[in-house]
């Protein structure tokens, strides 16, 4: 019996928005109990689903309740997996290794709380890898947004000196030693399997995820004849100023 995406338990979680209900969810993913945060508008409605895929690594870049409540307030049911090994979840964070299935199975969690069979993907930073793999491994995604998203795991290792120690430990070495493990985490070579339109949002002065990740993703998608749109913000870095961030979310 396949229990992937089956909810084990839920508990109320403090919400920063009086119009949005939050619950922490434990669900099955590849035999592991993984945690995530669910945000639902309190006003009843026929909402579409949004899978929010966080950035960072392990405890860095953890899901922020205010962020997913912001999307729920726009009229979505939002589910944000923490990924395995985080916040008491079983397994270990693998930086888009087997933990990509925590995102894939997160779609099944989301579908249990929406009436429309419409699920959209949103990924930030490392979440860019996760949204692309989810769209590659599923055929029921309606749209994809990758914001300041990673598209090349090898490039991330070389660009982020501060992450090298953690990545070597998680992946099992550097790209010179185990190049195939970084290539296997890089979705650029599999984008032919993506069937949903992709929106790429990126600041040209991003020092955490170089703009080249966006350029390469756009190039590979167009090379496969996929529908892709780009919003490049000149002069902006990894995190947009709050007002512009809100305006961008409202445009989505």
Annotate each predicted stretch with a short phrase:
Residues 2-43:
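N-terminal cap/lid segment of alpha/beta-hydrolase-fold proteins
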Residues 45-47, 52-91, 154:
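Short substrate-entry loop that stabilizes the transition state in hydrolases
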Residues 94-114:
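Alpha/beta-hydrolase active-site loop
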Residues 114-125:
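Alpha/beta-hydrolase fold nucleophile elbow
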Residues 128-139:
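Short glycine-enriched nucleophile-adjacent loop
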Residues 154-190, 196:
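Mobile cap/lid helix-loop segments that gate and shape the active-site cleft of serine hydrolases
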Residues 194, 200-202, 206:
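Short beta-strand/loop motif that positions the catalytic acidic residue
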Residues 215, 222-252:
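C-terminal catalytic histidine-bearing segment of alpha/beta-hydrolase fold enzymes
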């Amino acid at each position: 019996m396949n229990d992937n995406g089956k909810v084990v338990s839920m508990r109320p979680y403090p919400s920063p928005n009086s119009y949005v209900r939050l619950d922490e969810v434990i669900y099955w993913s590849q035999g592991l109990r993984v945690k995530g945060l669910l945000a639902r508008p309190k006003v009843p409605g026929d909402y579409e689903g949004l899978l929010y895929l966080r950035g960072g690594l392990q405890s860095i870049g953890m899901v922020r309740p205010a962020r997913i409540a912001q999307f729920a307030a726009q009229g979505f049911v939002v589910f944000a997996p923490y990924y395995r090994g985080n916040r008491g979840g079983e397994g270990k964070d693998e930086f888009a290794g087997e933990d990509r299935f925590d995102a894939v199975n997160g779609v099944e969690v989301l579908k249990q709380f929406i009436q429309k069979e419409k699920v959209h993907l949103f990924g930030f930073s490392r979440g860019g890898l996760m949204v692309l793999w989810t769209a590659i491994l599923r055929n029921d995604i309606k749209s994809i947004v990758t914001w300041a998203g990673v598209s090349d795991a090898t490039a991330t290792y070389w660009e982020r000196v501060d992450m090298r120690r953690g990545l070597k430990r998680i992946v099992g070495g550097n790209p010179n030693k185990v190049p195939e493990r970084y290539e296997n985490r890089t979705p650029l070579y599999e984008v032919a399997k993506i069937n949903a339109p992709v929106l790429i949002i990126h600041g040209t002065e991003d020092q955490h995820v170089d703009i080249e990740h966006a350029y390469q993703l756009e190039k590979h998608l167009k090379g496969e004849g996929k529908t892709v749109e780009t919003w490049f913000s000149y002069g902006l870095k990894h995190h947009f100023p709050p007002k512009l961030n809100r305006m961008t979310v409202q445009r989505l």
